[in-house]
């Protein structure tokens, strides 16, 4: 009888930077929040410049958060935004109307 086994792998890239925090969306409140993994130290990171945020990705090495705004599903007013990890220096990557109800994001690292 043969045995079937598995070898665990490290899903994180070696030496990849980390903020050590969870970042998540409050869709109904239109906010981006952050907390420690145990739920403590809850902070509002973004509370403006969003309309139904729906996708979120971090680039910790560059110090950025990227997110999508769905906008009104009946209108062509979706957008993609970026800010620093602390919510400062918010800019528009794709302006409202540049995409229709964008959803998830993926950041491709070099």
Predicted regions and their residues:
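Residue-level detector of Asp-centered blade-edge/turn motifs that repeat once per structural unit
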Residues: 16-18, 59-62, 107-110
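Surface loop/turn motifs at the tips and blade-to-blade linkers of beta-strand repeat domains
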Residues: 45-49, 93-98
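Short glycine/acidic-enriched loop and turn motifs that connect beta-strands
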Residues: 29-30, 71-75
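A short loop-to-beta-strand structural motif that recurs across blades of beta-propeller domains
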Residues: 31-33, 78-81
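An edge-strand/N-cap motif at the start of beta-rich repeat modules
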Residues: 12-43
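Conserved positions at the start
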Residues: 19, 53, 101-104
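Residue position within the beta-strands of beta-propeller blades
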Residues: 24, 66-68
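Hydrophobic core register within WD40 beta-propeller blades
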Residues: 4, 56-58, 103-107
């Amino acid at each position: 009888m043969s045995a079937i086994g598995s070898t665990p792998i490290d899903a994180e890239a070696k030496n990849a930077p980390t903020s050590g925090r969870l970042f998540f969306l409050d869709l109904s409140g239109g906010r981006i929040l952050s907390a420690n993994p145990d739920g403590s130290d809850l902070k509002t990171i973004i509370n403006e410049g969003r309309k139904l945020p729906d996708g979120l990705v971090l680039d910790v090495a560059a110090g950025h958060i990227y997110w999508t705004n769905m906008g009104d599903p009946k209108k062509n007013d979706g957008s993609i935004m970026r800010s620093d990890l602390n919510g400062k220096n918010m800019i528009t990557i794709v302006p409202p109307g540049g995409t229709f109800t964008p959803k998830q994001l993926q950041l491709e690292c070099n």
